């Protein structure tokens, strides 16, 4: 179960629904742990939770923008407007290529900052594509699968490759929940 301070990564975050739900859950845990019954937190603390815990990767720029916007809207949901206006030094977090990476999960140059202990939770719904000779736009996945010697990816299914690679980013006690084809 998700606990305060845990790190969550969605390697194919799309519009960010899994990340938004994880962020909401972490905020609710913080509210419960502090006995806060107002349903509101200081914007700086909300920013800290977001930057400490939430990570995502998505190839589509528009989807990355939706993810970042949704996370900021979630932050705003837990702030009273006067508190936000009173804090002149507060700045919204820069998420692009800091916590939300607009890149291919299989790109060897992906700059995803994996915590030293690994991620605590990896959740997502990777694409259910089977690589065939005519499949276009999957050069990084194709190369990663071809170079994979430890674990064979059944039928060149990209979702299975996501599961293998994501599993390697988990910490010793980490858990993954990915929607995969049967």
Predicted regions mapped to residue ranges:
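Conserved S-adenosyl-L-methionine
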Residues: 1-108, 180-182
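SAM-dependent methyltransferase catalytic-core segment centered on the flexible catalytic loop
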Residues: 17-40, 105-182
């Amino acid at each position: 179960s998700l606990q305060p301070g845990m790190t969550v990564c969605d390697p194919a975050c799309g519009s960010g629904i899994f990340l938004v739900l994880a962020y909401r859950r972490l905020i609710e845990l913080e509210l419960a742990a502090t006995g806060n019954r107002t349903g509101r937190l200081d914007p700086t603390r909300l920013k800290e939770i977001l930057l400490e815990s939430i990570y995502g990767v998505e190839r589509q720029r528009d989807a990355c923008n939706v993810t970042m916007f949704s996370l900021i809207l979630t932050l705003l949901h837990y702030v009273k407007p006067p508190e936000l206006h009173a804090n002149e030094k507060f700045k919204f977090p820069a998420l692009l290529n800091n916590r939300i990476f607009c890149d291919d999960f299989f790109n060897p140059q992906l700059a995803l900052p994996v915590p030293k202990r690994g991620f605590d939770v990896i959740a997502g719904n990777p694409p259910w594509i089977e690589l065939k000779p005519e499949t276009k736009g999957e050069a990084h996945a194709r190369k990663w699968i071809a170079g994979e010697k430890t674990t064979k990816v059944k039928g060149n299914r990209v979702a299975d490759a996501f599961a293998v690679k994501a599993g390697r980013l988990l910490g010793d006690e980490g858990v993954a929940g990915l929607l995969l084809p049967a």
